């Protein structure tokens, strides 16, 4: 196994910001699912999901995002969030949403992984 190379402060902070902004958005989205305001309920039901799954989806999203934000579990969190975002893409494709609605979760996934790559020596060692 290669020796871990040190990450510069600039790269570390760039990774924290690039990954942190979408993570913050996902935490807010998860919290909104727990509170269930009318627009969230309408949007979820409009995508073909019953209202009864909104809170469980919010809990899963918050847990996955917290795992992403904790350095020791960040890779697991990124993998789980990739699955979550893949489900979002599939939902938008299935319901015939706009291209933006389909690409938006993909962009989030790329930003999450890029942020993790910039701040995690294990991931950097894996990809050289």
Which ranges hold each PLM region?
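Extended, low-polarity transmembrane helix blocks
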Residues: 1-28, 70-128
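A short secondary-structure junction motif
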Residues: 29-33
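Generic helix-packing signal
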Residues: 34, 47-48, 87-90
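Core segments of alpha-helical transmembrane spans in multipass integral membrane proteins
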Residues: 24, 28, 49-69, 83
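Short juxtamembrane and helix-loop transition motifs at transmembrane-helix boundaries
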Residues: 34-46, 61-72
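Membrane interfacial helix motifs at helix-loop boundaries and amphipathic/re-entrant anchors
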Residues: 36, 40-42, 49, 93-100
